[in-house]
Amino acid sequence: MDVTIQHPWFRRALGPFYPSRLFDQFFGEGLFEYDLLPFLSSTISPYYRQSLFRTVLDSGISEVRSDRDKFVIFLDVKHFSPEDLTVKVLDDFVEIHGKHNERQDDHGYISREFHRRYRLPTAVDQSALSCSLSADGMLTFSGPKIVDPSHSERTIPVSREEKPSSAPSS
C-alpha cells in the first residue's frame, strides 16, 4: 500500500476558510501568530486548524431577517457607545454609521468607523421603526410590516370530481 507524504509547505492553511484578521473591524484587538503568517501554524503543526466558528464570530456579525410580520437587522457594534452611532432612514434605506475618535487601548491608539446601508422592504411601516443597543453591543433595528388584507392567507378547498380530467396526457 502506497502512502503519500506531503511536505508541510503544501499543507498551508491558506484560502477562504482561513482568512486573515488583519483587515476586519477588530484589527485593533491584537494579533495572533497565524494572523501574520497563516501558513506558519500548519508548517509547524499540520494538524492545527483555526476554528471556522471562531472566524465567523470575529468577523462582525450582521444579520437581516425579513419574515411575514416584521423586518429586523442585528449588527454587532460592541466597540461603539450609543453616542458613537447614528441610525437614519432615507427613502427605502436604513443607514447605520458608527465612529469613535482616536482613543487609547491595550495596544496603543485606535479609531474605528463603519457605514452600513440596508434596503427596507416596501411593506415595512416606517412610522413604527425602533432601534436598541443591548448591553453586549448588539444593535437591533426593527419594524413591523403592514399586512395587506388583499394578500391575506386563505385555504382553498379541494373538491373531487367524478369524471376524468380533460387535460391531455403525455
Curated annotation (Swiss-Prot):
Residues 52-161 form the sHSP domain. Residues 144-170 are annotated as: Disordered. One of its GO terms (molecular function) is metal ion binding. Zn(2+) 1 binds at H100, E102. GO terms for cellular component: cytoplasm; nucleus. The modification Phosphoserine is found at S45. The keyword NADP does not apply. Zn(2+) 2 binds at H107. Acetylation at Lys-70 may increase chaperone activity. PROSITE patterns: SHSP. Residues 148-164 have a biased composition (Basic and acidic residues). Residues 1-63 are annotated as: Required for complex formation with BFSP1 and BFSP2. The modification N-acetylmethionine is found at M1. GO terms for biological process: lens development in camera-type eye; negative regulation of apoptotic process; protein refolding; response to heat. The modification Deamidated asparagine is found at N101. Its main location: cytoplasm. The modification Deamidated glutamine is found at Q6, Q50. Contributes to the transparency and refractive index of the lens. Acts as a chaperone, preventing aggregation of various proteins under a wide range of stress conditions. Required for the correct formation of lens intermediate filaments as part of a complex composed of BFSP1, BFSP2 and CRYAA. Heteromer composed of three CRYAA and one CRYAB subunits. Inter-subunit bridging via zinc ions enhances stability, which is crucial as there is no protein turn over in the lens. Can also form homodimers and homotetramers (dimers of dimers) which serve as the building blocks of homooligomers. Within homooligomers, the zinc-binding motif is created from residues of 3 different molecules. His-100 and Glu-102 from one molecule are ligands of the zinc ion, and His-107 and His-151 residues from additional molecules complete the site with tetrahedral coordination geometry. Belongs to the small heat shock protein (HSP20) family. This is Alpha-crystallin A chain. It comes from Choloepus hoffmanni (Hoffmann's two-fingered sloth). The lineage of its organism: Eukaryota, Metazoa, Chordata, Craniata, Vertebrata. The gene is CRYAA.
